[in-house]
Amino acid sequence: MTKTLAGPAVAALLAAVAMPVAAQTTTLRIQNHNAPESTTGRLIAEFVENVETMSGGDIDVEMFYSASVVKSAETFDAAASGILDCDMTNGSYQTGKNPAFQFVADTMGGYDTPVQFHAWVSHGGGHEMIDDLYNAQGMTLVGNHVGGQESLNSTRPLAGAADLQDFKFRSPPGMESEIFANLGASPIVMDFTEIFTALETGIIDGADASTLANNVGLGIYDIAKHTTYPGFHSMSADHLACRTDVWEAMPEAHRAILTAAEKALALDLMTLTEVENGEALVTKLPELGVTVYDWSTEDRAAFREAAQTAWNDWATRTPETEAIVQSHRDFLQRIGLSE
């Protein structure tokens, strides 16, 4: 005898089948070290909007600017330990863990343009090398972003290498401090967010902060009336890196959205920095009374020589540093920037 489902049972079954499955949501607490009004800060705000729009609201990003939760250099560990979920600062802050972290962000005297650095990341094995380094710390690399060569800023003339003698300036931790110390300067390592106050109070004569455009946004040229341009000494790439268990728990679609939004941020930062650097050079810096110094070929060569000496030294410190330095050298040769 064939039994049929009663009307209420059929209705209940059909309702269950038709009921949409609730979308998985992702909530991320991310810290960066940029001021909201800076070039990078404004583009990070667009990154947040893009992520939330592309996910239909299923990814909720709580973004903290200007290292408002922990100090800039502590962001990576804060994400790894669960205070935050992701880090949007700079890998070179972590050179104390392994000197190889210097070369995930700023080769100093290596690449000339952001495109060349991104080419190494995307097509020279860079992403995999960085990710391996981060995985050992419980973090996963999503992507990198960099605007362009940075400018040194000073409250005193900075026309060439000779002016570096006894020049007290803010430096990030890592290889840069050693290079400039060898050139006669007195680098002082301090948090990115402390630069303005240190300049204002005279603790430092100048700073290595960021690009012309970002420096304008940070208000540095309200105090420091001397700067170098075009930049030559540093092109430091920030990153988006998330705690590995958080990253792996996300739906694949959410990981794809974050990766795509980070790539869009990287492209926008390169192009907007080009525009805003030019605007700063032509209009804003003259209005602020800033003197711009284009270092001679000889002075730039002196810096590059000091940087390459530092590369050789740092490459001996750990196997990971040796490998990543060699990777950069191989890629520089591959794209015709070195012999």
Predicted regions and their residues:
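N-terminal secretory/targeting leader peptides
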Residues: 10, 24-117, 125-339
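Short, conserved aromatic-histidine micro-motifs
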Residues: 121
